[in-house]
Amino acid sequence: MARRKRQPVAGEIAEETRQTILRVAEQLFMTYGYRAVTTRQLAEVCGLTQPALYHYFADKEEIYLAVVSEEIAKIHLALERIVRRADTVSERLQAVAGFLLSRMHYDLNLMLHDVRYEVSTKTRDKLDIQFRQGFIVPIAAIFEQGIQRGELRDVTQGGMAAFPAAYLFMTMLSGFATRVPLNATPRDLQAYQAASAETCVRILLHGIARSHG
């Protein structure tokens, strides 16, 4: 006798619906920005009524917080794996840069603008903490290891401390993320990301001045 297919329980259906909302919200927020997206629009794309949407999230800001928090958590796991590699500082920073550029399928500056100006202070403070823990802490660990191993100069030698260096790295990288070639093929995009990662790290570690001597 054939086994009957197990029917999903209410909790599973609820979680599936929640993930659908987050997936759709990510696409809309990262394409149009926080202000331009409405809960009515979100509900329609998800095939829900607005009251049904509010069953899962209290308001648009709570949805945005959940979307960005999930993205930061995913990126943090990947960065931690790169940190644990036995490569040089330059190699690991290039790996970080290449990975982050490949994940920036949305306008990073748009997201940073939304976090700074469109959400409440409470939500902004939460995301600032998550950004520091998810992005900056693992990247700073690479710089700190480089200082400890003698690959990088410390502050007393004219270098930078690990955390300021990590923030500088992210600032430089965001500039490359906003200059992706228009109508690029997947192969072109991959080549651009690899070249940009190498250029970003090379300039960060060695500067743009001609060497003397």
List each language-model region with its residue ranges.
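C-terminal peripheral helix-coil segments that are non-catalytic and often amphipathic
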Residues: M1-K5, F99-S102, Y106, Q133-R149, ...
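Helix-turn-helix
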Residues: A2, V9, T20, V24, ...
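Alpha-helical structural segments
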Residues: E16-Q27, T31, V45, E62-R84, ...
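Short coil/turn segments at alpha/beta junctions that flank glycine-rich nucleotide-binding fingerprints
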Residues: T31-R35, R85-A86, D107, R149
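Residue-level recognition of oxygen-bearing side chains
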Residues: D59-E62, T88, Q157
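Secondary-structure edge/capping motif, primarily at the C-terminal ends of alpha-helices
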Residues: I82, M111-V119, V180-A184
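All-alpha amphipathic helical-bundle segments outside canonical DNA-binding/catalytic cores
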Residues: S90-Q94, K126-R132, I147-M170, A191-A195
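Short secondary-structure transition hinges
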Residues: L101-A141, E151, T156-F163
